[in-house]
């Protein structure tokens, strides 16, 4: 129906989360109508991000440096580590302005049915951070769904005798993702976290 170039663009756009065929067509048509330099700037920004952005060597967040801005910030409370599944969760929690500790990004959640086991996540790195640093509390902020709860329980079992282990309070919808929660809900969940 359309040229192979348009069909390829639509196919690539549908690979993005939440983008179906109709939205992909709208985005493709918008990009084609836009001035050429705007489309090329978008392509350049995407290429730059893919080439420069990597994972922080300490926490697993996204960064262009060896360590991320949060890990380098001397004003952060280094006695508390908030464990999240993905770097996008760090951004969601930072928007609340309620948390001033450090983070640890697991890179996913335990899901044996999908082949995601403890060794596939950054759990060993978390255990080493807790042993090596002066950490007194670990806040488990995995998603409030089946895999997130299983991951939180698994980590809590390994940390319970070493540090205080807390979980975000209720208020987050079960089955939801942190990335899509609003700042007020996340702020309340952080403030009302509980011991496991």
Where on the chain are the PLM-derived regions?
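Long C-terminal interaction/binding lobes of large macromolecular proteins
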Residues: 2, 99-100, 127-196
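Short functional micro-motifs and their immediate structural scaffolds
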Residues: 63-65, 76
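Short cysteine-rich clusters marking metal-coordination/redox-active sites
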Residues: 56-59, 68-71
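Short metal-coordination and nucleic-acid-contact micro-motifs, chiefly zinc-binding Cys/His arrays
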Residues: 49-52, 64
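Extended, structured, electrostatic nucleic-acid-contact surfaces
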Residues: 1-17
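Extended interfacial segments that mediate partner engagement and assembly in macromolecular machines
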Residues: 24, 72-142
């Amino acid at each position: 129906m359309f040229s192979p170039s348009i069909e390829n663009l639509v196919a690539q756009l549908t690979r993005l989360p939440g983008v179906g065929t109709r939205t992909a067509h709208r985005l493709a048509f918008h990009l084609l109508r836009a001035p050429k330099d705007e489309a090329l700037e978008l392509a350049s920004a995407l290429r730059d991000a893919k080439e420069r952005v990597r994972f922080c060597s300490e926490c697993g967040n996204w960064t262009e440096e060896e360590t991320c801005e949060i890990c380098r910030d001397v004003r952060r409370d280094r006695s508390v580590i908030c464990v999240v599944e993905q770097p996008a969760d760090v951004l969601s929690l930072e928007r609340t302005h309620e948390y001033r500790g450090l983070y640890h990004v697991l890179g996913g959640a335990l899901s044996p049915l999908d082949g995601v086991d403890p060794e596939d996540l950054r759990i060993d790195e978390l255990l080493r951070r807790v042993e090596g640093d002066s950490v007194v509390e670990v806040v488990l902020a995995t998603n409030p769904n089946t895999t997130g709860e299983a991951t939180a329980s698994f980590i809590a079992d390994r940390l319970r005798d070493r540090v205080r282990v807390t979980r975000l309070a209720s208020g987050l919808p079960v089955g939801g993702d942190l990335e899509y929660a609003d700042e007020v809900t996340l702020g309340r969940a952080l403030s009302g976290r509980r011991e496991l």
